[in-house]
From Swiss-Prot:
Pfam families to which the protein is assigned, alphabetical: HHH_5 (PF14520), RuvA_C (PF07499), RuvA_N (PF01330)
Domain notes: Has three domains with a flexible linker between the domains II and III and assumes an 'L' shape. Domain III is highly mobile and contacts RuvB.
Region annotation Domain II: where it falls in the sequence: 65-143
Subcellular location: Cytoplasm
Organism of provenance: Thermotoga maritima (strain ATCC 43589 / DSM 3109 / JCM 10099 / NBRC 100826 / MSB8)
Protein's name in the database: Holliday junction branch migration complex subunit RuvA
Length: 188
């Protein structure tokens, strides 16, 4: 799997980027709208990526941060919701707001997003609410920042996620949550 791509943006066409790595390999990467707007043609970028293989072909999706990628992956697990629809959802709302909408079971808010029917919004909430509620974390930004930090330190994502869930207390700052999660992980 290709987890990330670092390189120079050769060309932008809508939400599709051509990124050349230092080794000279050029990747075609489909991004959400915000990520595409953030990168400049001719500029350097790093994208968190997901390689999708389906009967329609192979597509490399790119995101400016890990939270967007994680949300995209969660959305693609929803029945009858493919990567194209997941990308469309992420392109129309910021990740923190989407996570909050799902955790608070805001079907009405989700169904207002372009291309999302009420039934699709209900399915998203039904299938993902536990994933976001189980963390018991009101501020998902702190949760994801802490998770990213632990993963970047080399902890497997599953262990990092469990540690963050176990030690989180409402009102914690990101640095406190990381510190407590590291203590938890060191005692395992």
């Amino acid at each position: 799997m290709i987890a990330g791509i670092s390189g120079r943006v050769l060309k932008k066409s809508g939400n599709v980027l051509l990124v050349e790595t230092k080794s000279g390999v050029v990747f075609e990467i489909v991004c959400d709208v915000q990520t595409s707007e953030e990168v400049k043609e001719g500029g350097e970028c790093f994208l968190h990526t997901f390689l999708s293989v389906s009967q329609d072909g192979i597509t490399l999706y790119g995101f400016s941060n890990e939270m967007k990628k994680e949300l995209f992956l969660s959305l693609t697990k929803v029945s009858r919701l493919g990567p194209k629809t997941a990308l469309k959802i992420i392109s129309n709302e910021d990740a923190e707001t989407l996570v909050a909408m799902i955790a608070s079971q805001d079907v009405e808010g989700l169904s207002k997003l372009p291309g999302i029917s009420k039934k699709t919004a209900e399915r998203i909430v039904m299938e993902l609410k536990d994933e976001f509620e189980s963390a018991g974390i009101k501020d998902m930004r702190i949760y994801h920042e802490s998770l990213e930090a632990l993963v970047s330190l080399g902890y497997p994502e599953k262990q990092a996620r469990e540690a963050v869930k176990q030690v989180y207390r409402e009102g914690m700052k990101t640095s406190e949550l990381i510190k407590e999660a590291l203590k938890f992980l060191s005692h395992r």
